[in-house]
């Protein structure tokens, strides 16, 4: 309708007269909901000629005691000049914290983004999944750390039998597809 077109024109005109710094000072970021962002890694290696997936057993809630892929929350800061870590930095950090595998010791590539509402019972969480390959000679260096109660290199059948926390079975399925 004409009234809406006039309002849009007025808004566009207002933004044109502001400098970017004025716009950013007046920007109301609280107007938009903020989902949490996590990174999860589907980590693979070959042990005794069998494809294995690095799994952790969760130390705490939610899904305490369940199998999960290594991962965790992106460190975000509320400072426009220092907004926190990048996704890939978070993936390397989480992999090192939960498995003790040193940064740069494995191939890591972004796989897919998972954002289905309800995928995490704590809050709205969007997860950026990564595909990782660990050379077999380094696989034995992996040790549970951080919020992992234990760690294991399992074959796909073992994982299917035990099930996984969150939507990690879906992430794993995407990684092997």
What are these regions (language model features)?
Residues 2-6:
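Low-complexity, highly charged intrinsically disordered N-terminal segments
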Residues 14-18, 59-63, 149-153, 177:
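Short amphipathic alpha-helical segments, especially helix-boundary/capping motifs
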Residues 7-10, 50-56, 138-143, 169-171:
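Short, functional N-terminal and low-complexity linear motifs
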Residues 67, 74-176:
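Unchanged
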Residues 22, 26-69, 88, 103:
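N-terminal strand-loop-strand
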Residues 7-24:
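Entry/capping segment at the start of metal-dependent catalytic domains
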């Amino acid at each position: 309708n004409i009234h809406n077109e006039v309002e849009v024109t007025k808004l566009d005109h207002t933004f044109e007269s502001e400098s970017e710094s004025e716009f950013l000072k007046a920007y109301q970021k609280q107007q938009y909901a903020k989902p949490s962002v996590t990174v999860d890694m589907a980590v693979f290696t070959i042990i005794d000629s069998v494809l294995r997936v690095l799994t952790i057993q969760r130390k705490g809630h939610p899904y305490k005691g369940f199998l999960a892929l290594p991962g965790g929350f992106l460190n975000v800061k509320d400072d426009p000049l220092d907004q926190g870590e990048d996704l890939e930095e978070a993936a390397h950090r989480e992999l090192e914290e939960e498995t003790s595998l040193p940064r740069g010791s494995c191939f890591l590539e972004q796989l897919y983004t998972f954002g289905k509402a309800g995928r995490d019972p704590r809050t709205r969480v969007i997860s950026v999944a990564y595909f990782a390959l660990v050379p077999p000679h380094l696989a034995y260096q992996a040790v549970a750390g951080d919020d992992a109660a234990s760690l294991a290199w399992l074959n796909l059948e073992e994982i299917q039998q035990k099930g996984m926390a969150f939507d990690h079975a879906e992430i794993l399925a995407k990684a092997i597809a």
